Amino acid sequence: IKTLENKDVSVEAMRSYMIGRELSGHYYREDETASCGDEVVLKAEHISWGGVLHDVSFELHRGEILGFGGLSECGMHTLGRALYGLEDVLTGKVTLTKDDVEVKSPEVAFAHGMGYVSKNRDQESLVLNGTIGVNIQSTGYKANRGFGIFISDKKEKEYAQLQVDELAIKCNSIFQPVSAMSGGNKQKVVFGKWLAADADILILDCPTRGVDIGVKASMYKLINAMKKRGKSIVLISEELPELCGMSDRLIIMKDGAITGEFWRTDGFDSTELIDWMI
């Protein structure tokens, strides 16, 4: 237990005491300008679904972190599922422009380089009774094999171990059951499997929910690294500081529709953003 005087309290100090160490560098992104390519990698056109989504349209660019924010029931979580083909939209379509493919199922999305991190981690993103290795290998080890090329169990285990090491996943071995892990380490396993898949487009729905500040910092660093490698990310979050800290562009939703669009280069005003949410 650490007791502080009011005069000694700061956000940085609180973060350090909560995780037991100092966080080096900037918590979110250090740049204040939007930076992404001109190439459009995904188009969502006039998406409507079950009275929850109403005529939602937008484009995602290569190397862009596109944030979606709003109140919990604004429709953004359903939108994330629809983008990955997990919901059958009533009208509209989601297109991956590189292959000119319409996303109608998770199988199509995955086959064409998409990944999805659900906000319901234990129910939808992990095989809880499986090991760390099984979960990381579940996306098919795409980054290190070609179509039809057999990879030995030994190589797959080596790659799973590499992800454990690079993501600093705390565990006894890759044979440890995921169910026995903390929330933060479970989330690292989820990220590890999409790193193994080398997904070009990632839908991240509340990727830092239920993890400590240290793991959050690791996740932000990883998201930044993926952006710099040209990966495109849809970041759905109920945490406004997270959205403002990470997004190149930020779309606000209310009652299933887009109400505002804002750019990092222009600066994000939290008060203004909240006004568009409510």
Q: Where do the protein language model's features map onto the residues?
A:
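Glycine-rich phosphate-binding loops of nucleotide-dependent enzymes
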Residues: 1-278
